[in-house]
C-alpha cells in the first residue's frame, strides 16, 4: 500500500480499535503490520522535518504503533539469565537476525541493549546497553550510551551523543501530541531528561543533569528571555534556578552561551568508535 492508503486504513482501524484483537485478519491487520514494518525499516517516520525547520507529525503512524498492541498476544520471550525470559507482546527488533541481517543493518549493538520492533536504527549508530522503544528513529552516527533510554516515537538526529543515563521521553503514555525530538549534532549530558515533546534544535549542548519538559522555563542568561518547549540551535544549557514567590527559587534550564570551538572540542564525536 502507499502511505496514503496506509493512513486511510489506519485511521479506519483506529476508529474501530475496540474491535481489533489478535484474531483480526485481512486488510486491517495488513495495514498495521505494514506500517510497523515501514517504521522499523526507516521508510516511514512518526515525525519529519520540513524545509522551514518545523516538524510534521504523522499522527496516523503513532496510532499504528498503539494498534500493534491489539493484534499480538502475550508470549514468553526467551534469553534471560539462568534460562529465564520475559512476558511481552512486542518483538525484539533483532528477533531471528543472523550475521547477514546485522551486516546489512550497519550499526553496533552491544550486549544487553534492547530495541523493540518498529524502532529504526540507522547505519553507524552505536548502541551501548540501552533501551530504544517502539516507533523511535535514531539517525546515523549517533551514540546511545549506557543506560540511556530513547522513548516511544522519539526522533534522534545524526551524530547525536546521548550520554549515560539520559532519558528521552516517549509519546504513548501519557499520550503526547508530538514526539520528543533531538536534532542533528546535539550533545545531551549524563542523566539529563528531555520529555513531553520538547525539541532540542541542531547543535545544542545540554550539560549533565538538565531536565526539560513543556513547563520548564528555559532562560537565556544574556537577554533574560524565557521560552518553553524548545532549545534554540547551538545553545549551551545547564541547570539553574529562578526566584519565585514566597522567597523560594524554582528549577529552570539556563542558556549560558552559544556553542564555540572550546565546547565542540569537549563534545565532538569520536570517529574511532564508529569504525
Curated annotation (Swiss-Prot):
Statement: the UniProt record of this protein carries the keyword Methyltransferase: no
Known pathway: Amino-acid biosynthesis; L-lysine biosynthesis via DAP pathway; LL-2,6-diaminopimelate from (S)-tetrahydrodipicolinate (succinylase route): step 1/3
The family this protein is said to belong to: Belongs to the transferase hexapeptide repeat family.
Amino acids binding substrate: 108, 145
Keywords carried by this UniProt record: Acyltransferase, Amino-acid biosynthesis, Cytoplasm, Diaminopimelate biosynthesis, Lysine biosynthesis, Repeat, Transferase
InterPro entries assigned to the protein according to its UniProt record, in alphabetical order: DapD_Trfase_Hexpep_rpt_fam, Hexapep, Hexapep_transf_CS, THP_succinylTrfase_dom1, THP_succinylTrfase_N_sf, Trimer_LpxA-like_sf
Membrane-spanning parts: none
GO process terms (BP): diaminopimelate biosynthetic process; lysine biosynthetic process via diaminopimelate
EC number(s) given by UniProt: 2.3.1.117
GO molecular function, one term: nucleotidyltransferase activity
Keyword Transferase: yes
Summary of subunit composition and partner proteins: Homotrimer.
GO CC field: cytoplasm
Cellular compartment(s): Cytoplasm
Gene this chain is encoded by: dapD
Protein name: 2,3,4,5-tetrahydropyridine-2,6-dicarboxylate N-succinyltransferase
Reaction equations catalysed: (S)-2,3,4,5-tetrahydrodipicolinate + succinyl-CoA + H2O = (S)-2-succinylamino-6-oxoheptanedioate + CoA
Predominant location category: cytoplasm
Top-level division of the source organism's lineage: Bacteria
